[in-house]
Amino acid sequence: MFHDIDVPHDTRGDDSPVLSETPFLHEGARVVKSRLGSWTEIGKNTTIVESTIGDYTYDDGDVSIFYSEIGQYCSIANRVRINPGNHPGDRVTQHHMTYRRIKFGLDTQDDEEFFAWRRAHPCVIGHDVWIGHAAVILPGVRIGTGAVVGAGAVVTKNVDPYQVVVGVPARPLRSRFSDSVIDRILQSRWWDWTRPQLEERWRDLCSLPTFMEKYAP
């Protein structure tokens, strides 16, 4: 279930809330024209603009997410940047006064073509993805389900499901599981379990052999 959220400024605060179907926004969170799933938690001073966040996904604060689609059960660490702003390197000046013209009193309209390009290059992140502290996901990048992005990584290219990437620019380090196990987990689509199914089965997610035997034979 998604909730349409447009809360430019939120002042709620609780360091350890008990989550519910209603998205929880910590103090200073700003969510603009976005859709948040149930059991989601938006950290302190996080900004989310024109994005979709799936059920059970959370961030740890000071995160920036623009024009992105993020799946369910994702874990986003502190200070992550997803689809950060670009600058027009083909212009004489890269300064944003050339496209944020209203702010600098230069025009009555901003450069909508510039912003349209950014919207046309969304980041798409699968389910159960862990993004480490201060990682940056550049515009247009797709990250597969189950992937891990190491702390401080700058992701410039697509990441395969269940792949671990690290470094600047990010490069593959290893896969979390064998190809056959990855295929079977993907086919199980456990992230689509209903709430009653999750309450009944969540312990099985703690053991790969048990999970594979029951849900991904």
For each feature predicted by the language model, list its residue ranges.
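C-terminal segments of enzyme domains that contribute to small-molecule binding surfaces
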Residues: 1-10, 26, 95-137, 169-217
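Flexible, glycine/small-residue-enriched loop-and-beta-strand segment within the central core
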Residues: 13-15, 19-139, 168
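Conserved catalytic-core motifs of eukaryotic protein kinase domains, centered on the activation segment
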Residues: 86-88, 159, 175-177
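Short, glycine/charged-enriched secondary-structure capping and boundary segments
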Residues: 89-91, 163-164, 179-181
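Short-chain dehydrogenase/reductase
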Residues: 130, 148, 164-165
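Catalytic-loop Lys-Pro-X-Asn motif of eukaryotic-like protein kinases
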Residues: 133, 151, 161
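A generic "structured core" feature
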Residues: 144, 148-150, 154
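Acidic, glycine-centered active-site loop in nucleotide-sugar glycosyltransferases
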Residues: 161, 166-169
